[in-house]
Amino acid sequence: MARANGRSQNLRDKLDGNELDLSLSDLSEVPVRDLVAIPKATALDLSCNKLTSLPDDFCNLSYIVRLDLSKNQIAQLPSEFGRLVNLQHLDLLQNRIVALPVSFAQLKSLKWLDLKDNPLKPALAKVAGDCLDEKQCKECAQGVLQYMKSVQSDHERELQRKLQLDKDRKQRLEAQQRVKEEQDRELRKRMKQQQKERKRRDYNAMQEAQKALNNNKKKAEEEPSENHKPVPTPKEKKLARRQSRLRKIACILLFGLMVALLGVVACRFTDLKTFEVCRSVNAVYKETLSALHSNPVLERFLQDPSSQ
């Protein structure tokens, strides 16, 4: 703090009335904080230094009326330079300025401007003129202010155009978002409906299966199965075994009788009767037939067909 106060005091020593001369001071930056403490210095000379730029807070020195920045290496002015609303005289001779900030149009008090020996853009250089005398510098201030107002208008129109484009883009995005949300709602609704239909089908199928199961169960209860037949008693089992044996014996006897009859028929009515076996069979047949002649019915039935 003491050091800052010391610098401020040094600056005050250079103050002559309302003029503060800091030219040829080998400055590479503007001591803005020290200058703020000297609002009386409405005329500030910073010419012939090593300044390459002005800090943004330099624009807070709105009380400055006359500013000399000639013969430095300043490439551009702060974007808020237009806040120096009391500035009437501005010397920018021999710097490296190419263009002026848009806010320059707000310097409505500016009456005198020198932009000689700067690599200005052609349009700005044409408006600035030569600035060879007092009259031309005043004309320069007037022409440049008019030009910068036009630039400001173009800038504002471009800004409005960009804002409108951003607004339109935002509206399009919002519209697309609404469409997407509506599509998502429809999709969810359709999926929910499909899920509901699937659940209904599953429920109906389950009901049908349960109904069929109940019908089968009821039918099984009404028609006793093989497992529910009454268990036979020992007496019934014995009778069943006896009947089974009798059926087997009857089958064997019937089979034997059929074989015997077939043998008799074969030996009686085929060429086999000449064989020894058939002669024996025929002899037995004749003996049996003779023994049964006493029965008229059997005699007629067993009568030798050859004798008929």
Curated annotation (Swiss-Prot):
Main location, first listed in the record: membrane
Mapped LRR repeat ranges: 10-31, 40-61, 63-84, 86-107, 109-128
Tree of life domain: Eukaryota
Coiled-coil stretches noted in the UniProt entry, renumbered to this chain: 154-223
Positions of region (Disordered): 170-240
SUPFAM superfamilies: L domain-like (SSF52058)
Cytoplasmic side of membrane: 1-248
Entry keyword set: Coiled coil, Endoplasmic reticulum, Leucine-rich repeat, Membrane, Microsome, Nucleus, Repeat, Signal-anchor, Transmembrane, Transmembrane helix
Regions that span the bilayer: 249-269
Membrane topology: Single-pass type II membrane protein
Subcellular location: Microsome membrane; Endoplasmic reticulum membrane; Nucleus envelope
Composition bias type Basic and acidic residues, residue spans: 170-187, 194-203, 218-237
InterPro entries per record: Leu-rich_rpt, Leu-rich_rpt_typical-subtyp, LRR-SigEffector_domain, LRR_dom_sf
GO cellular component term of the entry, any: nuclear envelope
UniProt KW Transferase keyword: no
Lumenal side of membrane: 270-308
Role description: Required for nuclear import of FGF1.
Subunit structure: Interacts with SGO1.
PANTHER family in the cross-refs: LEUCINE-RICH REPEAT-CONTAINING, LEUCINE-RICH REPEAT-CONTAINING PROTEIN 59
Protein name according to UniProt: Leucine-rich repeat-containing protein 59
